[in-house]
A protein has these predicted regions:
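Small/polar, glycine/serine/threonine/aspartate-rich low-complexity segments that form flexible
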Residues: 6-43, 166-176, 208, 221-259
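Transmembrane beta-barrel architecture of outer-membrane proteins
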Residues: 34-38, 81, 126, 181, ...
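Periplasmic alpha-helical coiled-coil/stalk elements that build and connect Gram-negative outer-membrane
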Residues: 74-187, 199, 288-291, 295, ...
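Bacterial Sec-pathway N-terminal export signals of envelope proteins
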Residues: 1-10, 16, 43-44, 58, ...
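A glycine-/polar-enriched beta->alpha junction
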Residues: 1-4, 16, 38-56, 66-73, ...
């Protein structure tokens, strides 16, 4: 609602070709070259639409900020996934290489034991079959590592040695204590919900703006003008003009009413989209929380299984070396 100040000027050149009086005779021609300069100060007294537009623009900035946060989160997620997948591919390749070396030694050992008559040809074939399978898995792991490396470089940047990546299990964010806490935090900070809220607020302002188009507006202006060579009888003129303007666009062929109806329907649609986004968010948070808890339980179970498998493997290796257990067993 700040006033506006306008400076203007004009210069006219006259060239009268013919001028007659009432009796039909020629009249004297006195052309002038008027010069006008003016300064005008204008203040809007009543304009609801300007305030609504200002508030809508502020909401637009908040909406852009929420979209930026969402984009950042998407990039963070892709970066974390690329990082962990490359580590997984590297570890998988190391495991398959160790397994391949182990089975290679086992084939050599079984060949010697077969020559000594300690095992049968079936045992050797079983070892060779396992070795062939390990070779296929090793090649697949190498390809997975190459793909993971390319994905990492595409998202994060160049990396020369995948072994330089460190394994860290510490979360980069604080995990909520309960599911309800997680849902509550997501309702406040989830970018999708924030975007839906800001879009709803924008449509509300659009509806208010369309209604404001039917509300009267008022303005007040003060203009001072200076004129030289005004006419053949007037040389200079200085004039002050005070103007009050009231405008009320109460009818425009139904166009404004149609715009109001359109924005009202759009507001209802955005409100439904917000409700759907909130429900979808709660479902996703619940699913993510369940997956996290299941992963924790699964990890604990795997640790116990690995510990038991190590003990069992030591016994099996000892029996195998003594000859009391065959390769097929």
């Amino acid at each position: 609602y700040k006033p506006s100040l306008t400076l203007s000027g004009s210069k006219s050149f006259e060239d009268t070709n013919k001028l007659t009086n009432q009796s039909g005779g020629d009249a004297s021609i006195n052309d002038v070259e008027p010069l006008t300069k003016s300064i005008k100060l204008e203040q809007n007294l009543l304009d609801f639409n300007r305030g609504i537009t200002h508030k809508r623009n502020i909401i637009g900035l908040d909406l852009a900020s929420a979209k930026l946060i969402k984009k950042e989160q998407d990039i963070f997620y892709e970066a974390i996934e690329a990082y962990t997948q490359l580590i997984l591919a590297r570890e998988t390749l190391d495991i398959n290489k160790s397994n391949l070396d182990l089975l290679s030694r086992q084939v050599e050992n079984d060949q010697i034991r077969l020559d000594r008559g300690q095992i049968t040809i079936t045992d050797l074939s079983q070892s060779e079959s396992s070795f062939a399978g390990a070779q296929a898995q090793f090649i697949e792991a190498k390809n997975d590592l190459l793909i993971s490396k390319l994905t990492y470089e595409n998202i994060i940047g160049e990396i020369k040695d995948p072994n330089s990546l460190q394994k860290k299990s510490t979360a980069i964010v604080n995990i909520p204590e309960t599911l309800n806490d997680a849902i509550s935090i997501s309702k406040r900070k989830n970018p999708d919900i924030l975007i839906a809220k800001f879009e709803l607020d924008q449509t509300k302002k659009d509806l208010e703006s369309s209604k404001a188009d039917l509300i009267p507006t008022a303005s007040l202006s003060l203009e001072r003008s200076y004129s030289d060579d005004v006419s053949s009888t007037i040389d200079e003129r200085e004039k002050d003009t005070l103007t009050t303007t009231l405008s009320w666009p109460f009818y425009s062929g139904g166009k404004k009413r149609s715009t109001i109806s359109k924005n009202a329907n759009l507001t209802s649609r955005k409100r439904l989209l917000l409700d759907d986004t909130i429900q979808t968010n709660e479902t996703k948070v619940t699913s993510a929380w369940s997956s996290l808890e299941s992963s924790k339980s699964f990890l604990d179970s795997v640790k116990v299984q690995v510990k038991a498998a190590k003990i069992a493997n030591e016994g099996i290796v000892a029996e195998y070396e003594r000859g009391s257990r065959t390769t097929l067993d």
